[in-house]
Amino acid sequence: MAPITFHLDVVSAEKRIFSGRVETFQVTGSEGELGIFHGHTPLLSAIKPGMVRIVKQHGHEEFIYVSGGMVEVQPGTATVLADTAIRGEDLDAAKAEEAKRRAEEKIQNQHGDMDFAQAASELAKAIAQLRVIELTKKRR
């Protein structure tokens, strides 16, 4: 028996990144990891920088980096509305490594709470991008 699917849209301010039927998807919500399957209770949550792991029909996976945003789950459909969303294969590993290095430098040379919070946020985003790149490469 085939798994039950539901519709998922992943959109950013610039464009729709993904639209289709999925078996499940995972995203990092404000309170931790969320695994969404068909029939999930309706939900609205903020999402943190990280990845959206999508399991499409027949078990095919796709990874998308999101810089934060919201996830909404309704009966039969879900939407990830991201500030920024980039497919794993479109991320630049060299740029992500450089962003990680710069953020680590800022943390080492901090001059107040605001500098630290900004640098920690930049570091989290760079690490999330590198993780999506790594998982996308493994999938191939």
Swiss-Prot record:
This is ATP synthase epsilon chain. F-type ATPases have 2 components, CF(1) - the catalytic core - and CF(0) - the membrane proton channel. CF(1) has five subunits: alpha(3), beta(3), gamma(1), delta(1), epsilon(1). CF(0) has three main subunits: a, b and c. Belongs to the ATPase epsilon chain family. It is found in: Cell inner membrane. One of its GO terms (molecular function) is proton-transporting ATP synthase activity, rotational mechanism. HAMAP family: ATP_synth_epsil_bac (MF_00530). Keywords: ATP synthesis, Cell inner membrane, Cell membrane, CF(1), Hydrogen ion transport, Ion transport, Membrane, Transport. The lineage of its organism: Bacteria, Pseudomonadati, Pseudomonadota, Gammaproteobacteria, Vibrionales.
